[in-house]
Amino acid sequence: MQSSLPLCREFFEKITAYLDYHDFRLTITANQPSITLPYYVDEKAHSIELIIFKTTFLSLFQEAHTYFNKTFSDQSGISNENIYYMTVGFLLTTPENKTVYNVHEDLLKRYFQDNSVLVIPDLLVKEVRLIQRLLCSSNNRINKSSSLWILYRKLFVLSLDANTLVLPDILFVFHSSGSQHFSNYYCWNTARWFYDNLPYNKRIELFNLTKRFCFQNVKDCSSWSALAYMVCQQEEKKTDNIRDFQRLTSSFNVPFKINKVDLNFQVQPADAFTQELVKWIDRTYAADWPPYLCLLQITKFNITLRIEMDSVLLTWRNEILNFEENSGHIKMINNTPIVPEKFSNDLLTSVNFAHFGYKKLFLNKFLDKNKKEQSDS
């Protein structure tokens, strides 16, 4: 049967092509007068970029929307494949449409139980690539769609089935999606979920990727918060993530035996990471708040670490006193160190004001937290 959704189907075929390419970029951009094709593929040696022009994007939405209305008014000529392509069009253009999202998920469930429901070769492999590539797109609404991130979790669960030869490339997705959009909460919150449910060897890989990302993106508070969580997991949140994973395996009838050793495996002891982070802050003269907040969050959930932090606190306090003696008092506005005007053209001193200012803020918050807990006890 010829597709009634040529744009939606072509988009699906384009975005799920090159299955062996992990570095696949989806870009939505303004029309280019020199290009008349609805989609443009920029093929490089090690990466692929699929470019969708604005006119195509709007036409694709109109095509999916028209077909959506038809499915409710006239059921004749409706095929599961066309419904699937319609939902793909909506996942691109309006990913938070819950009605369409539910239709899409229902089709996946039915297909997983009976492959004849959708006559699309290698559908689950293509579905995983589709969602991964949407999550790595240049479009903020797609990249930060909570519905797509939840669907990605479900596809991971489906991929665990013994009959499914597909494995989501989670490391590339988190790095690419996190790099595309600064402080992507849904991306790094999903990373927490994966971290709590991955086998220990994959957990190590995710932890190392997150740590590298943070050290390379010092201002990204969402990734630093995820890193703090991985180092010192909150038991309640961890339990919620594990229960959600178990709920999904049950929902999709995926047999999966929990490995308690995996669940309780700690990638890097909190004290070892804390020492590494403190050395990194000192060595790089970190002049942004997220690394300090990460350190603060880790000590919040580990009483032993607070005692071991005494020598660090003393060293930092002396550094701050020496700096203020030579350069003047560090003033803060809305928890941000202010560089005096006379040093505004002095890059080194300006960085030092930020560096020692955030150390001072850390000390104040650390001590305030301890005082509050002592008064509450």
Curated annotation (Swiss-Prot):
Top-level taxon: Eukaryota
GO biological process: cell wall organization; endoplasmic reticulum to Golgi vesicle-mediated transport
Gene Ontology CC entries for this record: cytoplasm; Rab-protein geranylgeranyltransferase complex
SUPFAM superfamilies registered for this protein in UniProt: Protein prenylyltransferase (SSF48439)
Keywords: Cell wall biogenesis/degradation
Miscellaneous: Present with 846 molecules/cell in log phase SD medium.
Function, in words: May be involved in cell wall organization and biogenesis.
Listed name of the protein: Protein ECM9
Lineage, highest ranks first: Eukaryota, Fungi, Dikarya, Ascomycota, Saccharomycotina
